[in-house]
Regions:
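Phosphate-handling substructures
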Residues: 70-124
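Extreme N-terminal starter segment of soluble prokaryotic enzymes
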Residues: 1-5
Length: 124
């Protein structure tokens, strides 16, 4: 039987500062590096055949916790990136709530019908 582990990236500066980061290439925080160390410990005895990551710094760095300790290559692809959020990239969530609250509500509740300038549209 095949087992697939989905691991969210460790804390990045966008999480810490509550900024909108989809394709924006944010960096891992000190807390994020501690989370990566904990992941490495958690998965130390787990067998992996492959490790995939998006091509964003925060995801590749988080994937270190698995691929490096298991001697595996890291396969990166933009096809597994978070959704691109266009003109919202690197703006504080609180600002977006004030300036584009209706679209933000749709993003949080009905992403299949959400779209913002320069961002991805899920049905595409």
């Amino acid at each position: 039987m095949t087992t697939i582990y989905l691991i969210r990236h460790a804390e990045a500066d966008g999480n810490l500062y509550r900024r909108a980061h989809g394709w924006y290439d944010s960096v891992i925080t000190d807390r994020g590096y501690r989370q990566i160390a904990a992941l490495a410990k958690r998965f130390a005895s787990t067998r992996f055949d492959a490790v995939y990551s998006s091509d964003r710094h925060r995801t590749m760095t988080t994937a270190l916790s698995v691929y490096k300790t298991h001697g595996l290559p890291l396969v990166t692809t933009p096809r597994v990136r978070e959704i691109g959020i266009g003109v919202w990239e690197d703006h504080p969530w609180a600002e977006l709530e004030r300036t584009d609250g209706e679209q933000l509500e749709r993003f949080n509740t009905d992403a299949a019908h959400w779209h913002v300038a320069g961002g991805e549209y899920l049905p595409d």
